[in-house]
Amino acid sequence: MEREKEQFRKLFIGGLSFETTEESLRNYYEQWGKLTDCVVMRDPASKRSRGFGFVTFSSMAEVDAAMAARPHSIDGRVVEPKRAVAREESGKPGAHVTVKKLFVGGIKEDTEEHHLRDYFEEYGKIDTIEIITDRQSGKKRGFGFVTFDDHDPVDKIVLQKYHTINGHNAEVRKALSRQEMQEVQSSRSGRGGNFGFGDSRGGGGNFGPGPGSNFRGGSDGYGSGRGFGDGYNGYGGGPGGGNFGGSPGYGGGRGGYGGGGPGYGNQGGGYGGGYDNYGGGNYGSGNYNDFGNYNQQPSNYGPMKSGNFGGSRNMGGPYGGGNYGPGGSGGSGGYGGRSRY
């Protein structure tokens, strides 16, 4: 039987004790299945643990079993497991943010709430489902939201970009509120924000501002709660330098969700009007703002220039050698925010 793609079988494990080794990490996670890979990420110079690692199971069902058994505690410390983000997604704004709300695009007129519920309830407990309609005509605007009681169903669903719902191709993404997008953009600008990617140009991984946030030799090690760092074998790394979303980016002034094009909406001008507090309060008016290009090419969702994944290109072996960070500088890049992963 052909094995499922690695991206569906890999977990990022944050918050590891510096005493945790590959052996103890493996011993802990093997209670849910066979591991095909296990690594604790270490500083290439000092060999000191960087406080996170990755485990890869032999099947997605084993990953599901492990995530269903949270919280996890290893060597006396509660760790934070999360489905690893694949390289091609890792640099997109919000890729590492933990949310319980899922955006669903490509909803057709004949798709009702029960279709979404029937499809998505297999992933986890659903709190709410919203299909957005035009306030005047009552027609569906082509998108909606599904909110779960936990972040893991969302993380699992977005591993697969397209889903067939009621016979139609739908695209899924994490739904980020305006505040969450501002935090992402704050981190992108190097101000640190809640994500603490910081500047990171001075090789070694400066995790955001303030004392104690230098991951290499910093006294509090876990990046002052500001994020984790680099990629491993193409997974989970932080954004490549200034290319956090790249250009056109997540609606960064260009186009946005449906911006001027037909998009998924049926009005030919984006999703129109404001909704909730999402995307800068501007799901439309010609753009879906902070969510990225949802134009005629659904794949242009928060694009990032290919190849600019931390400039590392996985040099120096399967774990990316020592060159993990933005622009190939050796900086750390960052893995999401304080407790958002």
From Swiss-Prot:
Q: For the cross-link Glycyl lysine isopeptide (Lys-Gly) (interchain with G-Cter in SUMO2), list the residue numbers.
A: K10, K92, K100, K108, K125, K140, K156, K161, K174
**Annotated spans, Disordered:** 181-341
In this chain the RRM domain maps to 9-92, 100-179
As stated in the Swiss-Prot or TrEMBL entry, residues carrying the post-translational modification Phosphothreonine are T128, T147, T164
> Modified residue Asymmetric dimethylarginine is at which positions?
R191, R201, R254
GO BP term, pick one: mRNA export from nucleus
GO terms for molecular function, please?
A: miRNA binding; mRNA 3'-UTR binding; N6-methyladenosine-containing RNA reader activity; single-stranded telomeric DNA binding
- Can you cite an annotated GO cellular component? nucleoplasm
N6-acetyllysine carried by residues: K156, K161
Q: Which residues carry this modification: Phosphotyrosine?
A: Y319, Y335
Q: Identify the stretch(es) annotated as Nuclear targeting sequence.
A: 296-335
**Its principal location?**
nucleus
Write down the InterPro entries for this protein, in alphabetical order: HnRNPA1/A2_C, hnRNPA2B1_RRM1, Nucleotide-bd_a/b_plait_sf, RBD_domain_sf, RRM_dom
Q: What does this protein do?
A: Heterogeneous nuclear ribonucleoprotein (hnRNP) that associates with nascent pre-mRNAs, packaging them into hnRNP particles. The hnRNP particle arrangement on nascent hnRNA is non-random and sequence-dependent and serves to condense and stabilize the transcripts and minimize tangling and knotting. Packaging plays a role in various processes such as transcription, pre-mRNA processing, RNA nuclear export, subcellular location, mRNA translation and stability of mature mRNAs. Forms hnRNP particles with at least 20 other different hnRNP and heterogeneous nuclear RNA in the nucleus.
Q: How does it assemble?
A: Identified in the spliceosome C complex. Identified in a IGF2BP1-dependent mRNP granule complex containing untranslated mRNAs. Interacts with IGF2BP1. Interacts with C9orf72. Interacts with DGCR8. Interacts with TARDBP. Interacts with CKAP5. Interacts with PPIA/CYPA. Interacts (via C-terminus) with FAM76B; the interaction results in retention of HNRNPA2B1 in the nucleus and inhibition of the NF-kappa-B-mediated inflammatory pathway.
The free-text domain note is: The disordered region, when incubated at high concentration, is able to polymerize into labile, amyloid-like fibers and form cross-beta polymerization structures, probably driving the formation of hydrogels. In contrast to irreversible, pathogenic amyloids, the fibers polymerized from LC regions disassemble upon dilution. A number of evidence suggests that formation of cross-beta structures by LC regions mediate the formation of RNA granules, liquid-like droplets, and hydrogels.
Q: What is this protein called?
A: Heterogeneous nuclear ribonucleoproteins A2/B1
Write down the species.
Answer: Bos taurus (Bovine)
Quote the gene name from the UniProt entry.
HNRNPA2B1
